[in-house]
Structure formats: C-alpha cells, structure tokens
Amino acid sequence: MTELISIKDSSKHVDQKVKMHVWLTDKRSSGKIIFLQLRDGTAFFQGVVRKNDVSEEVFEAAKSLRQEASFYITGTVHEDKRSHFGYEIQISDLEIVSNNEGYPIGNKEHGVDFLLDNRHLWLRSKRPFAIMQIRNTMFKATVDFFEKEGFIKFDAPIFMHSAPEGTTQLFHVEYFNNDAYLSQSGQLYGEAGAMAYGKIFTFGPTFRAEESKGRRHMTEFWMMEPEMAWMHQDESLDIQERYLAYMVKQVLENNEYELRILGRDPEKLRPTTEGNFTRLPYDDAIKMLQEAGRDIKWGDDFGAPDEGYISEQFDRPVFIVNYPTTIKPFYMKKNPDNPKEYLCADVIAPEGYGEIFGGSEREGNYEILKKQIEEAGLNLEDYQWYLDLRKFGGVPHSGFGMGFERTIAWICKLDHIREAIPFPRLINRMQP
C-alpha cells in the first residue's frame, strides 16, 4: 500500500512512490507537461504531470484544476535543487476532492487592506505560512525552555477588576452589574503564582485600547510573563538572555526553509544565540542619544526612533537598565544605590525593532509597596490582595514580560506587527 506522507517529509522518500493530500496554489502548462504548485500546510513544492506518463483522465483532471483546489496525488519524489524546498513529485495519479472557481487572492500584487479583508484565505500563502511556522517554533521553544528551567505554566484571568499599571488604555466590559476590564498583563497574578510555586510563566492574550496606527501596536496581542520568587534583577537578566538566545537558536535550527521564504538573512540572528548582551545603564543611553544630536534629557522615556538608534549600535539585543522611577510602574523595586531609579530593564531588539521585553525586580516590602501604590494615585482597596503577597511570606522576586508578536516581527524582519498574528486586531480592524 502506498504510504500517505506530508510534503515536509519528502526528503525521507526520495525515489519512492507516495501519496499526499494537497491544495493547488498555482499552475502552468507547456502543452504536454503541467506544473502544479502545491501546499499541504507543512511546506510548498512542485508537482509535475506529464501527458505521456499518465492516463488521459488524470491529465484532463490536472488541466481542470483551479487555484485552491483540493485533491489527492500519487507519485514519485525527486530532488529539485532549483527550489526553496529542494524536492518535487512526478505525479502518476490524481483524485479531486474540491475544485471551485473564484478564489479572490490571485497571483498578482494586492493591497494590504484587501489581503487583511481576506486574511482567512491569505493565511494559506507562502509568506504568512512561513511566519506562522516560525511563531509555532518560538512557542514550543518557550515552553521547552521554561520547563527545563523548573518553571510551571500558570494561567492568569482575562477579566480584571482593576488595571495592573493604573493606565487608561483599558477595554471596559460590563460584568453583570459591575465594571470589568480586559487584561493588559497577567503579571500581578503571576506574582501570586510565584509565591505559591516558586517559578511560573503566563502566556496568553492581552488587550490595550491604544489609539495607534503604528507598525508596533495592536489592540490584542500575546504576552509571555515569567515571575520568579527568591530572585534578584541580575539573575532575571541572566534568564532573559538565555531564553532569547535559546529561542532564536531553535528558529535557526528548525526554520531554515521558512527564513528563506521570507528572505531573512540568518546571519543577522546568529549573534543573539551567543548571549553576552550589553547591559546599558539608562544614563549612558541618554548620553548616547544626546551625542547623536537627539533632543532628549534625563527623565524622558525613549520613543521608537530613540530605541531604533540605540539598537543599531549593537549586533544583538541590548538591555537598557535602571530607568527613572517617574516613567515606570509602581510595583518595581527602587535601586538601593540611587532611589531615583528602579531596578528594571527593557530588552531592545537589533535592526531598529525596539523594545521586546520589559522587566524588573518587584518591590517586596509591604509598607514601601503600599506607599508606591498611593503615590501612583491608585485605590488601595483594589490592591489589598496584591499587598497580601508581601504581608504573608514576602520575599525578593523578579519578573519580566515579552511581547510575542514584537519578537516575531524582529526575528522574521516584518514591516508591521500585524503579520505576526493569525488574525490581527487593530484600531480600525476587527474582522475577519
């Protein structure tokens, strides 16, 4: 019996007769030979139908195929060094499952709005395929890394009674007779998990009502947020560096084909796998920007152009450490050597992609945290449960958050973050 295989496994079946179920992405003919561009969800490659090698019925069936037709093929796998994939199949038999007209995404240039309107179909194309495969590798690498480091996966709620950072960028939801908000971060609940289980990570969707059309912003995105009990900031930075190096290494090892589809130079990513990220003090980053002629002073936060300039000075991610307390959230621990600073850090991705991680040592002292909540103008009652984490067995602890789509955008070298998620939610888009 002929074995049913995926396109991705073609290399294991060279010169063997196999069966596949596929979709058609494109077709061309030179009279007695029909070239079918095929996909099956694991890879793309070419199928060749030669009139002299198949029955008339099979040849006519191949001629009738329309874009995105679905069908079974039987044939023999051969090497094809001219293609990205490296293999093709000489088809001997074909059985059509579905073959309809009118597929809207043709083999021509389409505008972004048209493609986003048809995102449910655009996902089938080569570029989105490559990005989603890399996204999947990064997800698997994340789970593998943190399990090996002794973390457990911990699930934070989506409905929130209050905002974790006192922000106004919240989606309000009517929760029966009460007000609720969609989560902007699982961090505070992650800290509760760390006090129960030592080391945890949350990984899920978050929501921010940012009225921005910028290339780095969406209203719904995924965050990966570890929290670690008994850990100071320097140890947290070590984990962040190892994690990012491991994740990029996994992409380089498992997604060579997808990187080729995207035209992404893997050598630009390789330095990240070596670690050794510079830990640049905020003060020095300000001086660097001032020396470059930028209008910025101590106490200002960095804009995207500032982060882009800093990132271009390094061949791998860089930590910017110890920001002023005036521009970071209330839950961070102040630097004992300089109380105007928090023990915090952002990871800035290379090639102008800006911030992808943000983290800090959390304030572990009950009275100090209570004061910082009051100074931030927040309702103490809303945060009493959070203060309890310090009141009962509080310990030094640290954590960070990674913007998953921002990190994907850098690794894949995307122009806009909307490509990094299957169905982007933007200020002007909620469908499909």
From Swiss-Prot:
Catalyzed reaction equations: tRNA(Asn) + L-asparagine + ATP = L-asparaginyl-tRNA(Asn) + AMP + diphosphate + H(+)
Tagged with keyword Protein biosynthesis: yes
Record's GO cellular component terms: cytoplasm
GO biological process: asparaginyl-tRNA aminoacylation
SUPFAM superfamilies membership: Class II aaRS and biotin synthetases, Nucleic acid-binding proteins
Keywords, alphabetical: Aminoacyl-tRNA synthetase, ATP-binding, Cytoplasm, Ligase, Nucleotide-binding, Protein biosynthesis
Main location group: cytoplasm
Name assigned to this protein: Asparagine--tRNA ligase
UniProt organism field: Lactobacillus gasseri (strain ATCC 33323 / DSM 20243 / BCRC 14619 / CIP 102991 / JCM 1131 / KCTC 3163 / NCIMB 11718 / NCTC 13722 / AM63)
